[in-house]
Amino acid sequence: MARFDDPKQRPYKLPDLCTELNTSLQDVSIACVYCKATLERTEVYQFAFKDLCIVYRDCIAYAACHKCIDFYSRIRELRYYSNSVYGETLEKITNTELYNLLIRCLRCQKPLNPAEKRRHLKDKRRFHSIAGQYRGQCNTCCDQARQERLRRRRETQV
């Protein structure tokens, strides 16, 4: 991986890094900042799709793999949870429409799309303040959590 000594010249998004290195998303090789493993191609695509920022350690670019994103998202939730509010309350607090707010998923860190924000409003689900940022759940993580609850319920029933 190339070194970026000048912080002003560093790309902070994966597509920008690919442009700077004159490569493509499928050919870029980048390590996880936490576990140091090289991201697989699907993880590179997920990182770019989630619009996450690249971090630099000793002038070298790092991303984060799927397992580490899940793990450290949970740690951040446990350490920095502040409060939970409904969508209407969040709009009043921020004085901004819900659809104009950047709200990421609790687990996978994907930005919630308008349909996922609407689902929170319709189902009366709360948004959670974690480390000063409001979080919700994307459809994928919400469905996975529901499946996990059902599985646990079946295991505990006799």
UniProtKB/Swiss-Prot annotation:
Gene Ontology molecular functions: DNA binding; PDZ domain binding; zinc ion binding
Alphabetical keyword list: Activator, DNA-binding, Early protein, Host cytoplasm, Host nucleus, Host-virus interaction, Inhibition of host innate immune response by virus, Inhibition of host IRF3 by virus, Inhibition of host RLR pathway by virus, Metal-binding, Modulation of host cell apoptosis by virus, Oncogene, Transcription, Transcription regulation, Viral immunoevasion, Zinc, Zinc-finger
Zinc finger boundaries on the chain: unnamed: 32-68, 105-141
Role, per record: This protein has transforming activity in vitro.
Family under the similarity heading: Belongs to the papillomaviridae E6 protein family.
Protein name: Protein E6
Any one of the GO CC terms: host cell cytoplasm
UniProt-listed SUPFAM superfamilies: E6 C-terminal domain-like
Chain positions of motif PDZ-binding domain: 156-158
One GO term (biological process): DNA-templated transcription
Assembly mode: Forms homodimers. Interacts with ubiquitin-protein ligase UBE3A/E6-AP and thus forms a complex with human TP53. Interacts with human NFX1 and MAGI3. Interacts with human IRF3; this interaction inhibits the establishment of antiviral state. Interacts with human TYK2; this interaction inhibits JAK-STAT activation by interferon alpha. Interacts with host DLG1; this interaction leads to the proteasomal degradation of DLG1.
TM ranges: none
Subcellular localization(s) per the UniProt record: Host cytoplasm; Host nucleus
Key word Metal-binding present: yes
